[in-house]
Amino acid sequence: MLRKQPGFTAVAVITLALAIGANTAIFSVVYPVLLRPLPFRDSNLLVTVGESRTKIGCCAYAASYPDYLDWKSSAKSFQSVAGYAGDAWTITGNGDPKTVFAAMVTTNFFSTLGVTPMLGRDFMPGEDLPEGSGPTVAMLTYSFWHSDFGSNPDIIGRVVRLDGVPVTIVGILPRDFELTPAGILPIWVPLHLNPFERAARGSHWLSVIGRLAPGATLQQARVEMAAINERLAQQYPRDNANVHVSVGPLRQQVAGDVRPLLLILFVAVGLGLLIACANVANLMLSRSLERRREFAIRTALGASQLHLVVQLLIESLLLSLLGAMLGLIAASIGIWLLERSLSDAQLAFMPYLNDVRLSLPVIGFVGGVTILTAILFGLWPGLSISNMPISDILKDESRGGTSRSQNRLRNALVIAEIAISVVLLVAGGLMLQSVRAVLRLNPGFEPEHLLTFLITLPAGPYPLAKDWPFENPNALRFMHEFIDRLGAVPGVVGASGTSGLPVSQNLQGDRFVVEGRAVAPGQEESVTTRRVDSAYFSTMKIPVMRGRGFTRADNATGVPVALVNQAWVKHYFPDGKDAIGARIRFTVAAQEPYREIVGVVGDVAEDNLAAPSPPTVYVPVDQQSGYATNFNFVIRTSGDPVAILPSVRAAANAIDPELAFVQAQSMDDFMNRSPAIFLRRYPFYLIGSFAVLALVLATIGLYGLISYSVSQRTREIGIRMALGAQRENILRLTIREGIVDAVTGVVVGLILSLVLTRLMASMLYGVKAHDWLTFLVVPLLLLSIAVIASYIPARRATEVDPMIALRNE
């Protein structure tokens, strides 16, 4: 029967393909993030343990190394506790120099996770001893081994150089190994610390993972860690008095901030599937009504009602299977487009997107959706027809009409389509306003014509001093020479560098005190800190509001100085007193000097565009040259910033040919790919697409309903007109039928929207979840479209010739 009506079949299959494809694409992301078991032994026993401070400033979900050692020796709720931290390294000895992000781990890290190398061996106790200039062994991830070493099975024992230090590859990690909170880290080495780092209890940088002991629960671990934390606060009030310890499932860290986003998208595509089912159900109902004489005859010849329902369900299943096959193709295209649109930086932020594919669980999901879809849109029409007595079928056939129950079912399906369309359009409208609000924000600097990239200087030729203040004169010398050379590159207007880029969600914090203000040990507040060179503010076009900026005279031999932003002044000098001349001191080391505040600069979106600028302190990198080892350079150009990249590379390689650039891109691209914009723009694109599709389907459904109603009421319309009804009366009568359904659907949709949009509140910026403008525009838009969709068939109804209609009847 499906081949006899190719138009019906094509419309139904395409509708289902779009809906099933969207559900498949989103589920292929949801599965690796929220549902797939972590690739570790007994992953439900793995937890993250971290420290944070509740006062203003940046608070990292990380621990200090001394606290980690205390936890490891004291906590009985854990079978083992391990730590890791990320860093950037330059690898040589395998082609061109390449900067990669690597992880430094305690030697029990992989045994804690329950991971065994697929080739080679694990790290051994003692390989993380602090003696020497760095790690001597390393393990590679499967993907890095495959991409950079050609899956060479003889890789074990090979020596490469990390930051100029020879390192022996001792193992290859399993193919499915991935620690999402750490990002994409292709190289793993044992942790090596200098004496200061091992003793710095106030320095929080180590991410900690624990494996619960047999019989221990998460709550028991939390209670025990709180008790240990209280003891440490009493023993070390200067560093631990204001520290809070958090213990949570490792799975929670995997999803992070994207969990609510994925759930909302999954709900959106689910609603889209319901609309598709309602639309196809209406098509099936219309088609089954046209076949009612066939069903009546078959029933009279002995066919049971169950047999008729099964036949319609089989036809529905065939439609669903065809839709699923096309949907899989559509989902594959969608996944390919997603992969193409993501930058390496975004994949580092959300590395689980590397696992988005049509895996077996995803295929199983498609199978389940296919069967469910067939039942949803095939069962109702089948039951509606099979439950009608033969006499009613023949009577309705002779009158050309349909039963009230069938009309109510068709109306209910259209109302459901309109209601769901309202929900999706409201969600899309809120996301649109949120994206526009974020894009209109002033980041505090001018991103146009800026080129940015990271250079990591290898430890060999650029050694960091082993004692405080950990200076790196070679790194500082490179930075100055590089910036001076950039000044001679055609098209370069200015060049500078910073320890951290704005809008990067990479806040670096230090505890500090203001001179003359009594602060109890451990009660110091944390503040976002950036180390920058003297040309940073002019290059970025960040205004100096009061005082002065930095100069190259602000070096290691000069008076220690600092700049602060307006947010810092408002928080620490709320009485309006001038902050210039005040002195502050970082408390990370007793030897840290007081720094005089010499200027106040404008606020910059350091965290993300949608977050208020945090109180920030800027320190000249010339006075803390250790931070020049990993430095983000920013170059302002007179034209396209990416066009000068070859000349910029040449300037760097003229100084050191073994340096590599990381994440070289324009600042505009960097900001557009930042989580603040990306995690709002993509949901808007997706939800907006679903909303438009839902609107089209609902419009088609309403148009089809009124058209079918007109065709079934030809005799009634003819009688009305024969009795004197004017064409305007017929027009209003027919349009009113569509408007009643539309209004009902809009009201139901608005009620649902009021409830469901609360789930989106955390994703919105600059707009409330119950924004009155959105809740006004969407109903007006839908009602306007409903009038148009109803007018066309209603207009056709007014052209009925009463005599011809009565004669045909």
Identify the function of each model-found stretch.
Residues 28-29, 281, 317-393, 433, ...:
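Small-residue-rich transmembrane alpha-helices
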Residues 5-33, 275-277, 320-325, 410-434, ...:
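Short, strongly hydrophobic transmembrane alpha-helices
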